[in-house]
Regions:
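Asparagine-centered strand-capping/turn motif at beta-strand->loop junctions
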Residues: 1-8
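"Short basic amphipathic alpha-helical interaction patches in structured regions
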Residues: 2, 15-17, 81-84
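Predominantly extracellular/luminal cell-surface or secreted proteins
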Residues: 4, 19-21, 140, 217
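Surface loops and adjacent helix of pleckstrin homology
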Residues: 6, 16, 70
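Short, hydrophobic/aromatic beta-strand segments
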Residues: 9-20, 78
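Eukaryotic short linear interaction motifs
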Residues: 10, 25-27, 74-75
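Short aromatic-acidic-glycine turn motif
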Residues: 19-35
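Solvent-exposed beta-edge/loop recognition patches
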Residues: 38-229
Length: 230
């Protein structure tokens, strides 16, 4: 994942959250959320946070940083020489403390939430969905508290599954800095699950395990400086 500073100011990554939203795969059969939530939340399956004390990880205007699932050179013989990915220059990674995917030199993202708990769970590696995932980055305003592990008001189950004990983090829309939604392919254009106020459209690469990704389109501002289009 590549995060850009699309502003004219130095921004700090410290304390910014990253979440993949549910459903992890695009579907027209959407979850049912509490009626009282209205349109005020996005719902996170797993949540991470950038480390730092507030000013440790600056991002200058026009700069970007990379967060890798596994910040190694995936083309090494011990992994997959046919892989298109060399993640060894990544600044951050989602380290799951799995000896099969040992901790790399990149800074570790801090794990915040999964299935209602702070623990990472038993899944061996954090993976990006190849079937069209949806993601947000967000920041909790100064003076506000957001704790989906210990605050019952900040997590919920999918009410279409009455006996479910799988919890999702309620992410206030007002906290969200940016969102991206992908689907499997163009046949899933009617399967949007991210609120339009966060991402009005959807996109896709059209195939699985094809070595392709998605990116914002480049443009320029009034002074001719390069910017990333929303």
């Amino acid at each position: 994942y590549e995060i850009y500073n699309n502003s004219a100011d130095i921004l700090y990554l410290d304390g910014i959250y990253f979440a993949n939203l549910t459903p992890g795969t695009a579907t027209t059969k959407l979850p049912i959320w509490p009626e009282a939530d209205g349109n005020n939340y996005a719902y996170g399956e797993r949540v991470w946070k950038f480390p730092g004390n507030g000013t440790e990880y600056p991002l200058a205007p026009g700069e970007s940083c990379i967060i890798s699932q596994f910040a190694a050179n995936h083309q090494l013989d011990i992994y997959n020489p046919q892989s298109p990915i060399d993640g060894s220059s990544s600044e951050f990674e989602f380290n799951m403390n799995n000896p099969n995917f040992p901790d790399q030199a990149a800074y570790d993202m801090q794990h915040v939430f999964y299935q209602g708990k702070a623990e990472m769970g038993s899944i061996p590696q954090y993976l990006t969905s190849v079937f069209g995932g949806a993601y947000v980055i967000f920041r909790v305003p100064e003076g506000e508290a957001w704790d989906p592990v210990n605050d019952e008001n900040m997590k919920t189950t999918d009410l279409s599954k009455p006996n479910s004990n799988v919890y999702y983090a309620k992410i206030p829309i007002k906290y969200v800095l940016d969102a991206v939604e992908a689907v499997n392919n163009e046949s899933k254009m009617n399967a949007k699950r991210v609120p339009g106020v966060l991402d009005a459209g959807i996109t896709w690469v059209g195939a699985t395990y094809c070595g392709l990704g998605i990116a914002r389109k480049l443009s320029t501002d009034e002074e001719g400086n390069p910017i990333i289009r929303e």
